């Protein structure tokens, strides 16, 4: 059996700042010990400190990842840039940089070892050892059985979580349940993917049993224990792992017995999770509004019925001794520069196009990828792509003309920077050029944005998981240092109830329960505002906008489920995992091309090609583009200025302002151009333009606007008249250029061996007895021989 050398030193303690039930005095006394005194395991507070230490090192963190410690969380990282979500080649799809240990242009990333093999707090196996040490210590202490179960149950979930993060990449990894001697000769065999799967499921079943008495009725959903791992957390993580185990990445034969067993277990677990008070967040008496869908990410305590695996944060500023700061950086990342945000994140135009239309069907952009889904009868216009879309579109993307308020103000006395008070902030990110010759250049980045965004502008912004008008941060304006949204305490949901339903839908479909599987998707759609039947003229649909064939054809059912995952879980760090699990880069048709691959790696289930089976166009060979809305060439040639001199509000670089002052402005009511009779000032220009703004924070947006008291769809139609008069959509080159812009026409290239990752050279050097995975080179350049899928 293959072996592993693990070299580790040290133990330490750190406060888990998200849990106020921990004693600050105790934590201050116990910090920075290299070894935990066994006596602490006879004291509940001491044991809680050990548990909190494990939480602090293992909880998901939107400020990190994807790396050995954290998964992707939805930003434009190396994994998300391998999907439809972002342009720019991520590490696994770059056609110019083939990955391999020795002969590759670039070495594969390390998700197995970690930053420092000799520091228990900075590597994978140190974190696992830390958890094992706490389990052994607490079980050997003098606490009551009830107290031990509450603490150890949480540790079992943490251990399963750590194993899941390496298992999903490497399949077969060492299983370590104790704390072996720390010495060079300490060797642990590498187990198979099946053995690791069974180990994780056993840990989670044990955790669920331990935690059911104290959390099975939802007791920890409120108070100081909110966000601690519970029975529901254990079952939710088990649900995710089972979905992976049933998918073709690990189930090449399409083993029906495996799928049926997982389906039975997952369905029983769902009943327990429901009984604990969890479900899709739908406020009683409010209908299904997209504002509520967006606010789902901002809830805490009893209101939060959606979050099943949660990381909490605070607004404490860093630098304290000890440092208890734990800030969620997401809001800072996604906000534009003229709010004192980090500048924003730019999603691709590709996924924007794939989003459903208002009748639930796909437009031409979506049909390019999904051939089995219902085609929309609603017109799609790339110039105004926000018209007639699935309601979730409007709380995922930020485009010119939306109101995106925040607390505080970024304005500074005597400057033109950041010209809005937070409660009135409007995103106007249309762009212009300095040179008319660049207006049609799809590769030029020499653009300037409105409202002093200037060269910091993005054509499209990501707004998903913004706190919106909940303001879960301590805003720091320019007068106080300008840190903006840095100190945010918004929680982060790694697993939420919607994913739970979609995981079960996948497996139910595989077990032949197509109607049941579609029923779970309908729940997601209904929460997003769809109805069983919509009769509004021009937007008629049945069946919540789903294709009827999903209830009778397995491939179509899977396509509908995976499509709903792509939309509902967009920009939450899940898409690359889904594409790997379902082999969507090439359908899994090329495993035989991997050097040394056994016959058992050949995909037999799903017709031997998952892409053909579900009607999805393989992602290999595709490109992603970006989008911007530029001032039309008929408006001052699409050309404006590059700066806005301090104190000169009336000397704006915006060509639209110059144009309307001289030629008249669009009237929001009549749609006609009328003479400009007001003062030619920034204040008057802003007031006029604000008449076209869509107030998404203040309005209820549903997919049947006939029932909405405030019709945001009508507001969007009015905004479209502004676009059609002053702006035009321009596709900007996303993929396809190298650093010196001499290579054109590059396309997504994901190699078959990337589905099951191999170890990089640094990992193998530190573990010379660790044999490489089939398809990857060892550190001597030889071919790997370890088969993680062997049983």
Q: Which residues does each predicted region cover?
A:
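Bacterial Sec-dependent N-terminal signal peptides
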Residues: 3, 16-42, 200, 239, ...
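Long, intrinsically disordered, low-complexity segments
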Residues: 22-23, 124-125, 199-201, 225, ...
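An aromatic- and glycine-enriched ligand-binding surface/loop that stacks and positions planar moieties
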Residues: 23-94, 205, 232, 240-442, ...
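Conserved, well-structured interaction surfaces
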Residues: 43-52, 56-67, 90-170, 185-198, ...
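Short coil/turn linking the two alpha-helices of tandem helical-hairpin repeats
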Residues: 167-168, 172-174, 215, 244-253, ...
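C-terminal substrate/ligand-recognition segments
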Residues: 383-524
């Amino acid at each position: 059996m293959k072996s592993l050398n693990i070299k580790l030193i040290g133990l330490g303690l750190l406060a888990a700042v998200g849990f106020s039930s921990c004693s600050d005095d105790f934590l201050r006394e116990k910090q920075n010990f290299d070894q935990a005194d066994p006596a602490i395991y006879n004291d509940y507070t001491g044991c809680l400190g050990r548990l909190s230490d494990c939480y602090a090192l293992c909880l998901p963190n939107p400020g990190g990842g994807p790396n050995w410690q954290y998964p992707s969380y939805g930003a434009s990282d190396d994994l998300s840039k391998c999907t439809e979500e972002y342009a720019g080649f991520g590490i696994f799809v770059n056609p110019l940089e083939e990955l391999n240990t020795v002969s590759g242009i670039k070495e594969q990333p390390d998700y197995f070892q970690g930053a420092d093999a000799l520091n228990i707090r900075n590597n994978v196996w140190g974190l696992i050892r830390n958890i094992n040490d706490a389990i052994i210590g607490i079980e050997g202490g003098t606490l009551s059985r009830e107290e031990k179960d509450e603490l150890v149950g949480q540790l079992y979930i943490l251990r399963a979580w750590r194993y899941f993060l390496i298992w999903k990449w490497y399949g077969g990894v060492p299983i370590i349940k104790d704390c072996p001697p720390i010495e060079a000769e300490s060797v642990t065999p590498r187990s198979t993917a099946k053995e690791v799967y069974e180990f994780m499921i056993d840990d989670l079943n044990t955790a669920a049993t331990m935690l059911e008495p104290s959390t099975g009725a939802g007791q920890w959903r409120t108070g100081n224990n909110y966000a601690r791992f519970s029975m529901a957390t254990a079952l939710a993580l088990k649900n995710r792992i089972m979905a992976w185990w049933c998918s073709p990445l690990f189930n090449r034969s399409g083993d029906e017995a495996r799928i049926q067993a997982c389906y039975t277990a997952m369905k029983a677990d769902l009943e327990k999770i429901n009984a604990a008070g969890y479900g899709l967040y739908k406020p009683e008496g409010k209908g299904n509004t997209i504002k509520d869908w967006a606010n789902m990410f901002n809830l805490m305590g009893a209101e939060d019925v959606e979050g099943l695996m949660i990381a909490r944060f605070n607004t404490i500023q860093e630098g304290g001794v000890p440092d208890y700061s734990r800030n969620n950086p997401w809001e800072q990342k996604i906000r534009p520069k003229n709010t004192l945000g980090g500048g924003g994140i730019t999603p691709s135009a590709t996924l924007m196009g794939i989003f459903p239309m208002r009748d639930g069907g796909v437009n031409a952009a979506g049909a390019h990828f999904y051939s089995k889904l219902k085609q929309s009868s609603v017109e799609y216009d790339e110039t105004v792509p926000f018209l007639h879309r699935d309601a979730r579109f409007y709380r995922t993307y930020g485009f010119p003309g939306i109101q995106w308020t925040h607390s505080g103000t970024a304005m500074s006395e005597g400057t033109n920077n950041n010209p809005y008070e937070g409660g009135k902030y409007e995103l106007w990110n249309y762009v212009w050029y300095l040179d008319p010759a660049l207006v049609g250049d799809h590769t030029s980045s020499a653009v300037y944005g409105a409202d002093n965004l200037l060269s910091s502008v993005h054509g499209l912004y990501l707004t998903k998981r913004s706190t919106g008008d909940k303001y879960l941060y301590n805003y720091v304006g320019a007068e106080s240092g300008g840190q903006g949204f840095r100190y945010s305490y918004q929680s982060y949901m790694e697993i939420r109830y919607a994913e739970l339903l979609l995981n079960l839908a996948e497996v139910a479909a595989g077990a032949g329960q197509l109607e049941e599987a579609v029923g779970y998707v309908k729940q997601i759609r209904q929460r997003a505002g769809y109805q069983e039947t919509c009769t509004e003229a021009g937007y008629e649909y049945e069946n919540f906008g789903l294709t009827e064939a999903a209830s009778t054809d397995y491939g179509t059912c899977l396509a509908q489920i995976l499509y709903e995952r792509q939309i509902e879980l967009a920009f939450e760090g899940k898409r690359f995992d889904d594409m790997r699990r379902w082999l969507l880069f090439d359908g899994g048709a090329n495993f035989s091309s991997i050097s040394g691959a056994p016959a058992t790696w050949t995909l037999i289930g799903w017709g031997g090609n998952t892409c053909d089976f579900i009607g999805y166009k393989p992602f290999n060979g595709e490109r992603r583009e970006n989008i911007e809305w530029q001032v039309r060439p008929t408006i001052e040639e699409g050309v404006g200025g590059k700066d806005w001199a301090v104190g000169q509000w009336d000397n704006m670089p915006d060509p639209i302002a110059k144009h309307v002052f001289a030629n008249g402005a669009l009237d929001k009511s009549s749609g006609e151009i009328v003479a400009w009779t007001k003062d030619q000032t920034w204040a008057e220009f802003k007031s006029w333009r604000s008449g076209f703004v869509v107030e998404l924070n203040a309005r209820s947006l549903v997919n049947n606007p006939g029932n909405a008291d405030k019709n945001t769809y009508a507001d969007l139609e009015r905004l479209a008249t502004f676009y059609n008069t002053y702006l035009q959509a321009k596709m900007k080159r996303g993929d396809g250029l190298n650093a010196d812009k001499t290579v054109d026409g590059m396309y997504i290239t994901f190699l078959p061996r990337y589905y099951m990752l191999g170890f990089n050279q640094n990992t193998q050097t530190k573990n010379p007895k660790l044999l490489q995975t089939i398809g990857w080179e060892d550190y001597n350049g030889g071919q790997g021989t370890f088969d993680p899928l062997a049983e």
